[in-house]
């Protein structure tokens, strides 16, 4: 974590008044690593938790607006126009979140979507599961995983180093934010539906956690959970 983001996290910590038990634990220094939250199975309900433990997701390059749509709803007083925004955030090293925000103005909807994405951050497994590579570096997914949303189904397949991301543009943005650099993919269904496609990719990444791994697999595929180089937040 760079000094700039350490200072940002400290400012958030000084000004923040937690409203949840997990927030208090972070504020009091009982939890100093984002991995600990997922290991204990806590639910993140305050975006400030991410601002403190994973402040680099606030960098402009670590936030992506994936889709902006205009929604119209008829009410007794006439038409009600609102914006719906789909956004993703990530640290490009094992953590990624996806969120949807609504608002009368685009800027408000974007901010809401980014905050919801922070609350929805997941920790993923990475590694080198490609038989063409076997470098044991966390540049791809360690094994094939599949995600589904609505009619859309996405399958992510380990790729060798240098391959890049063989998937649609929305999928590329999510995978890059998660720290996945090389992957093959198969897609099924109405993939032009941006929201469902994005959620299917996100669910596939989440499903890396549903596969039990052995010490032999960790060694063979170079599997890491979350950050490739875990760090603990300190104010020094």
Swiss-Prot record:
UniProt-recorded name of the protein: Small ribosomal subunit protein uS5
Function: With S4 and S12 plays an important role in translational accuracy.
GO CC field: cytosolic small ribosomal subunit
GO biological process: translation
Similarity comment text for this entry: Belongs to the universal ribosomal protein uS5 family.
Organism field: Pyrococcus furiosus (strain ATCC 43587 / DSM 3638 / JCM 8422 / Vc1)
GO terms of molecular function: rRNA binding; structural constituent of ribosome
PANTHER family assigned to the protein according to its UniProt record, in alphabetical order: 40S RIBOSOMAL PROTEIN S2 (PTHR13718:SF4), RIBOSOMAL S SUBUNIT (PTHR13718)
Domain commentary: The N-terminal domain interacts with the head of the 30S subunit; the C-terminal domain interacts with the body and contacts protein S4. The interaction surface between S4 and S5 is involved in control of translational fidelity.
Keywords attached to this entry: Ribonucleoprotein, Ribosomal protein, RNA-binding, rRNA-binding
UniProt subunit comment: Part of the 30S ribosomal subunit. Contacts protein S4.
Coiled coil: none
UniProt domain S5 DRBM: residue ranges: 61-124
